[in-house]
């Protein structure tokens, strides 16, 4: 029974690690953009962002003051027995402990009263997503603290099949332009295509939080990624929306089969502080990563 191994201390730890340690692929993304940025203001802003990463890590400080909405993506491999309710309670306890023991700013409030319990938890929060893999005897838990700047700029369009792929491309470009600097670019632009309305939005967030260098498993989605990536960094939005070549690290696409009468597309963005952390449990023990 794996539930005894998944304790709140581990889930507290990946929340804190996500807030303090930027994944290696994002650091490499910064180097790549810094090497190609030609706009003086954009170059200066990228330099400041890179220095911020170093200062945060050297001093074990947070990368950003926004501790986000906590999202836990749980992937259950073959041969793994998990007490789901116990795992949920461990996640809630881990979030609460991270917030109160570190301490962290709790960014989670009731939607109408705006009451903050100072736990980073509330009704249906942390967000917990469950998926399954063919990895033998492995339980993986990814933690993503999703900041409000990137989350606020989210869109869903229920397009028509007759609109084709062109409406998807136009919609994504319009969203990037409308977001401007509000998403703290350079961003990862996540695009969900297909499914139902809720699945499409979910896929856009999956895309936005994928590691740089990864590619959509659907060949058609991968082609769409290439086409959109070629356009987005020519829009001139630039770092923090103040102009430049570096509007996005990448455009990521995730697709799903959809109804014959539907053509949904959703956009969700991840800010330049594209934070995530992972805990992987196997019979050999626990390991942390990204």
Give residue spans per PLM region.
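Domain-length cofactor-binding catalytic modules of enzymes
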Residues: 10-13, 28-29, 211, 215-290
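Flexible, glycine/charged-enriched surface loops at secondary-structure junctions
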Residues: 22-30, 41-46, 60, 100-114, ...
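Translation machinery proteins
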Residues: 37-61, 117-122
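Conserved phosphate/anionic-ligand binding catalytic regions in large, soluble enzymes, centered on
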Residues: 59-75, 182-200, 260-268
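A generic, well-ordered mixed alpha/beta core segment in the N-terminal half of proteins
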Residues: 68-134
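Short acidic, glycine/serine/threonine-rich loops at helix termini
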Residues: 74-76, 84-86, 154-156, 198-205, ...
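Conserved mixed alpha/beta catalytic, RNA-binding, or beta-rich assembly cores of soluble enzyme
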Residues: 137-214
């Amino acid at each position: 029974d794996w539930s005894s191994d998944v304790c709140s201390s581990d889930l507290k730890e990946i929340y804190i690690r996500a807030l303090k340690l930027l994944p290696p692929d994002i650091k490499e993304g910064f180097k790549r953009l810094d090497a190609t940025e030609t706009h003086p203001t954009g170059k200066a802003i990228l330099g400041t962002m890179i220095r911020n990463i170093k200062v945060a890590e050297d001093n074990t400080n947070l990368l950003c003051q926004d501790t986000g909405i906590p999202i836990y993506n749980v992937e259950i491999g073959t041969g793994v027995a998990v007490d789901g309710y116990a795992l949920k309670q461990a996640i809630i306890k881990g979030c609460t402990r991270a917030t109160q023991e570190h301490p962290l700013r709790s960014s989670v409030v009731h939607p109408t009263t705006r009451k903050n319990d100072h736990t980073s938890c509330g009704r249906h929060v942390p967000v917990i997503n469950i998926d399954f893999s063919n990895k033998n005897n492995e339980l993986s838990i990814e933690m993503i603290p999703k900041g409000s700047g990137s989350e606020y700029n989210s869109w869903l369009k229920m397009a028509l099949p007759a609109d084709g792929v062109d409406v998807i491309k136009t919609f994504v470009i319009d969203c990037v332009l409308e977001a401007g600097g509000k998403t703290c670019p350079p961003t990862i632009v996540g695009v969900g295509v297909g499914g139902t309305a809720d699945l499409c939005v979910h896929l856009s967030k999956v895309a936005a939080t994928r590691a740089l260098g990864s590619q959509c498993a659907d060949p058609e989605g991968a082609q769409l990624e290439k086409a959109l990536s070629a356009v987005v960094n020519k829009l001139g939005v630039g770092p923090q929306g103040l102009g430049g070549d570096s509007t996005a690290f990448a455009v990521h696409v995730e697709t799903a089969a959809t109804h014959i009468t539907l053509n949904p597309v959703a956009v969700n963005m991840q800010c330049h502080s594209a934070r995530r952390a992972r805990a992987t449990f196997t019979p050999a023990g626990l390991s942390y990563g990204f």
